[in-house]
């Protein structure tokens, strides 16, 4: 019985989950919900099902795997990762993992907050000014390692790829000063399962955000 991943028909919070499902060769199907156009942005496709799925905290994305019904994107990632030994093992690795998971979510939210703000054009320069310092910290944290926890890929690398690459989409030159982050992106995209997925019709790199966003809505 394949797992079911439910989310809007966008990249959004599901990108790293889809990538991890593909990398682990998991059997899954997607339930993609479509949001209506402006000005109403009708969400009835999702709202009609929201409280009928048996979710403890009904939200998108969700993952249903038999009797396991999970919401919260990082909880979903951790669930898949545990099945495939893609979590940190030592105390040091788990500390790095926990820090990174939350740090990348902060960075993800900063970009999302900007892109949904009606004053996007006014606020964009401030974001771009702060971006190099943020990326510098990630570059230092990665160092000369191939993956963020060391020699072994883990689920936080999937979050890292999503956040770093969407900033690269937002500002194409942002990683130029950080060759190890650029190499990380290339290394990730070069993984056999990831490369195959990116060439498939299932791959959904855009739109980054919902139709309500000022940037990344197409």
From Swiss-Prot:
UniProt cross-references to InterPro entries, sorted A to Z: Glutathione-S-Trfase_C-like, Glutathione-S-Trfase_C_sf, Glutathione_S-Trfase, Glutathione_S-Trfase_N, GST_C, GST_mu, GST_superfamily, Thioredoxin-like_sf
Residue ranges constituting the GST C-terminal domain according to the UniProt record: 90-208
Species annotation: Homo sapiens
Sites annotated Important for substrate specificity: 210
Places the protein is found: Cytoplasm
Ligand binding (substrate): 116
Function statement: Conjugation of reduced glutathione to a wide number of exogenous and endogenous hydrophobic electrophiles. Participates in the formation of novel hepoxilin regioisomers.
GO cellular component terms listed in the entry, alphabetical order: cytoplasm; cytosol; extracellular exosome; intercellular bridge; sarcoplasmic reticulum
Assembly notes: Homodimer.
Presence of the UniProt keyword Cytoplasm in the record: yes
Name of the protein in question: Glutathione S-transferase Mu 2
Residue ranges constituting the GST N-terminal domain according to the UniProt record: 2-88
Record EC number: 2.5.1.18
Class of the enzyme per the UniProt entry, highest EC level: transferase
Gene name tied to this protein: GSTM2
Alphabetical GO biological process terms: cellular detoxification of nitrogen compound; cellular response to caffeine; glutathione metabolic process; hepoxilin biosynthetic process; linoleic acid metabolic process; nitrobenzene metabolic process; regulation of cardiac muscle contraction by regulation of the release of sequestered calcium ion; regulation of release of sequestered calcium ion into cytosol by sarcoplasmic reticulum
Key word Phosphoprotein present: yes
Modified-residue entries (Phosphoserine), positions: 27, 44
Reactions the enzyme catalyzes: RX + glutathione = an S-substituted glutathione + a halide anion + H(+); 11(S)-hydroxy-14(S),15(S)-epoxy-(5Z,8Z,12E)-eicosatrienoate + glutathione = (11S,15S)-dihydroxy-14(R)-S-glutathionyl-(5Z,8Z,12E)-eicosatrienoate
One Pfam family per UniProt: GST_C
Major localization class: cytoplasm
Tissue specificity comment: Muscle.
One Gene Ontology term of the molecular function aspect: glutathione peroxidase activity
Matches recorded under PROSITE patterns: GST_CTER, GST_NTER
Gene3D superfamilies: 1.20.1050.10, Glutaredoxin
């Amino acid at each position: 019985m394949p797992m079911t991943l439910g989310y809007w028909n966008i990249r959004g919070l599901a990108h790293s989950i889809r990538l991890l499902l593909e990398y682990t060769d998991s059997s899954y199907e997607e339930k993609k919900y479509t949001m209506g156009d402006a000005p109403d942005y009708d969400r009835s496709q999702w709202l009609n099902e929201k409280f009928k799925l048996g979710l403890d905290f009904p939200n998108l994305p969700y993952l249903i795997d038999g009797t396991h019904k999970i919401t919260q994107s990082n909880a979903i990632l951790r669930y898949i990762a545990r099945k495939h030994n893609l979590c940190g093992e030592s105390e040091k690795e788990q500390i790095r993992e926990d820090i990174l998971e939350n740090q990348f979510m902060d960075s993800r939210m900063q970009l999302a907050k900007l892109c949904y703000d009606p004053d996007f054009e006014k606020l964009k320069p401030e974001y771009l000014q702060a971006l190099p310092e943020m990326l510098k910290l990630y570059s230092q944290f990665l160092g000369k390692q191939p993956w963020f926890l060391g020699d072994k890929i883990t689920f936080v690398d999937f979050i890292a790829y999503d956040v770093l690459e969407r900033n690269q989409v937002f500002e194409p030159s942002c990683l130029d000063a950080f060759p190890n982050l650029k190499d990380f992106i290339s290394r990730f995209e070069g993984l056999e399962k990831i490369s195959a997925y990116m060439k498939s019709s299932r791959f959904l790199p855009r739109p980054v955000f919902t139709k309500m966003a000022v940037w990344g809505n197409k």
